Amino acid sequence: MGSQIIHNSQKPHVVCVPYPAQGHINPMMRVAKLLHARGFYVTFVNTVYNHNRFLRSRGSNALDGLPSFRFESIADGLPETDMDATQDITALCESTMKNCLAPFRELLQRINAGDNVPPVSCIVSDGCMSFTLDVAEELGVPEVLFWTTSGCAFLAYLHFYLFIEKGLCPLKDESYLTKEYLEDTVIDFIPTMKNVKLKDIPSFIRTTNPDDVMISFALRETERAKRASAIILNTFDDLEHDVVHAMQSILPPVYSVGPLHLLANREIEEGSEIGMMSSNLWKEEMECLDWLDTKTQNSVIYINFGSITVLSVKQLVEFAWGLAGSGKEFLWVIRPDLVAGEEAMVPPDFLMETKDRSMLASWCPQEKVLSHPAIGGFLTHCGWNSILESLSCGVPMVCWPFFADQQMNCKFCCDEWDVGIEIGGDVKREEVEAVVRELMDGEKGKKMREKAVEWQRLAEKATEHKLGSSVMNFETVVSKFLLGQKSQD
């Protein structure tokens, strides 16, 4: 009897497993913090590579955690390196798929054998780390999969099998990679999606290799998603209701629980121990906020291509001179590894010409930057976190998608949500200059800003009180799935 009482008094224990890239770790950290605030004991599992990057960027105590929020790590199976760069995504996907199951199983066995922590009662895993499902099933605990892409991109991934059936993938040869073919090929078989072209589909589809790793990975992970207890998406009902509704017939229950940064901000004090826990792999330069404080409202364009995008030297130079030619003030985040294979260096004469109206940083607190009154526009790679943060702050966008879900995100930003203007893939300084001016000063830019402010209102409505759609959905996922009884063998 006594042992039963002790067992019932133990906290539920969630193991959170993000895919090991910055844009996946941040939203998973928010989910983990929200669960911790609801009384869960949290184990947050990074790869050894990223665990070591955290320690280098944030100090040796950065991952000490709290008594009920612990960090663990598992090997990703790739050769060890000390570089502070984003790993090759294809190699990482292949390696996690093949190599992570055994170390993850061993980690959970070790946790469950310990005396000082409650037994693992549920798992929340990135949708791209579905090997975790095998362990959840072995333990008889529920698993919620978190797909960190947009709903529209996830729906496209769910239909990749049809591209193969219809002979659209792989492409027959390199000649099909032309702009004309990608723009002229209409895709009319994804539910709810209209006027979609092959160029808008997540970029992994653009392969001539019948054994392409990323196609195999997408097919495998979307198929395995059907085994989850439930699926959560970092979006909100007003933004992607039709898309999410279309998934419900082919998947376990799907819930919109975003924007997660708004949900977390509403519930977690920034200055609290849990609030101060950071998940950034790069050290943020806070000075950019001081610089923005000296600028007038809506006067600055912010440029950040995220944590994975790489540019050629030529593209970097074209962006630089386009920004210079626009005459606008700008804050530009240039990661050290932004240029493929070498250090990212902008032309010295560009620096001289723009020194009185620009600030360059290697990384910054993006959410704080986008919410700053001085920011009037955002030149973005269309990563989903960036788009959600921009919409949540009412900031319109210039869109330059790089890979993966970003093409689809760009399409919806520009054509469905009316908050974006696209720049062509082969960057030209004249186009950059013209589009930045249109965004900041033009009639189209003004309409986009008004629309962005409307989306801001709807994002806040979904997250700011207990009747918000995302708040209610999050509570449902917690009570119905994560706190549900262990499944019986």
UniProtKB/Swiss-Prot annotation:
Involved in the O-glucosylation of trans-zeatin and dihydrozeatin. Also active in vitro on cis-zeatin. Not active on N-glucosylated substrates. One of its GO terms (molecular function) is glucuronosyltransferase activity. The lineage of its organism: Eukaryota, Viridiplantae, Streptophyta, Embryophyta, Tracheophyta. It comes from Arabidopsis thaliana. InterPro entries: UDP_glucos_trans, UDP_glycos_trans_CS. It comes from the Eukaryota. Keywords: Glycosyltransferase, Transferase. UDP-alpha-D-glucose binds at residues 307, 364-366, 381-389, 403-406. This is UDP-glycosyltransferase 85A1.
